[in-house]
Regions:
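Conserved donor NDP-sugar-binding/catalytic core segment of glycosyltransferases
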Residues: 92, 96-126
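Conserved nucleotide-sugar donor-binding catalytic segment
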Residues: 126-214
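Acidic helix N-cap motif at the loop->helix transition within catalytic regions
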Residues: 16-19, 44-52
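N-proximal low-complexity "stem/linker" segments adjacent to membrane-targeting elements
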Residues: 1-27
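Glycine-rich, basic loop-to-helix element that forms the pyrophosphate-binding segment
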Residues: 21, 46, 62-79
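A conserved acidic beta->alpha catalytic loop
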Residues: 31, 39-48, 88, 92
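Short aromatic/hydrophobic "clamp" motif used to bind/position activated sugar donors
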Residues: 84
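Cell-envelope/extracellular polymer assembly enzymes that use nucleotide-activated donors
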Residues: 3-6, 34, 171
Length: 253
């Protein structure tokens, strides 16, 4: 019987983070999911650890790949759940009820995005998805893939661009939401905890470069990006989101 969710973990030589992620996934109160791990041929004991947990893992592979999005696409081809969520090594669900709370809201849209705790070396912040997606938001910000549920069939039909190193998930959403009118819905619950030592967070210059390349490919040039005036509703939502973000930072939550 088809599962509701495919939880996917991609890993390469991050045994410490992998243990944290697997522990979080296996502690979930929700049971209607499959667990897939794609390891890039690690040499730090990751493969052996995955093998020790194989009775709890539906599918896994450890072999050389061509980058994170190649590994993610490999997992997508294996996935049989209705929705995919990528909880890559090091990141984890917020609580043991996170998947159960989010799954209640998965009901037909192409993308569902929940709230994310972002942790750096000094403090924690809460990242909130917009209640109403706008081009302004996706132009200027990102969606945390650790808290994003994407319809599996959409991912199979339109896999991630493996030529991009760190923004392919963002580009996937931009193209499918803006041009193909795929549906989006915010989930008002904290789904995941994300640590800022990931490649996309620590490579600001590459992120800007790749985003510019995506804009040029989709719109012809960055000068042709839509100039959309911020609505009163968007402004109110942005102010509320910014306030909540700053409050959490001030409280170090």
């Amino acid at each position: 019987m088809k599962k509701k969710v495919s939880v996917i973990t991609v890993n390469y030589n991050n045994l410490k983070g992998l243990k944290r992620t697997i522990s979080s996934v296996l502690s979930q109160s929700f049971s209607d999911f499959e667990y897939i791990i794609v390891d890039g041929g690690s040499s730090d004991g990751s493969k052996e650890y995955i093998e020790s947990k194989r009775e709890y893992i539906n599918q896994w592979v450890s072999e050389k790949d061509h980058g994170v999005y190649n590994a993610m696409n490999k997992a997508i081809r294996m996935a049989q759940g209705e929705y995919c969520i990528f909880m890559n090594s090091g990141d984890h669900f917020f609580s043991s009820q996170s998947l159960e709370n989010a799954a209640k809201m998965l009901n037909g849209s192409d993308y569902y995005v929940g709230e994310t705790i972002i942790i750096d070396s000094k403090l924690a912040s809460l990242c909130l998805p917009p209640q109403n997606m706008s081009f302004r938001f996706i132009r200027d910000k990102v969606l945390q893939h650790q808290s994003t549920f994407t319809r599996t069939q959409l991912l199979k039909e339109h896999p991630y661009n493996e030529n991009l190193k760190i923004v392919s998930d963002w580009a996937h959403f931009l193209e499918n939401w803006y041009f193909k009118k795929c549906s989006y819905q915010a989930i008002n619950t904290i789904v995941a905890v994300y640590y800022t030592d990931g490649i996309s967070f620590t490579n600001g210059d590459l992120l800007k470069k790749e985003r510019k390349e995506v804009f040029s490919e989709l719109f012809g040039s960055t000068s042709k990006l839509p100039h959309i005036k911020e609505t009163a509703e968007e402004k109110k939502e942005r102010i509320n989101d910014d306030f909540a973000f700053k409050l959490k930072k001030a409280l170090k939550m």
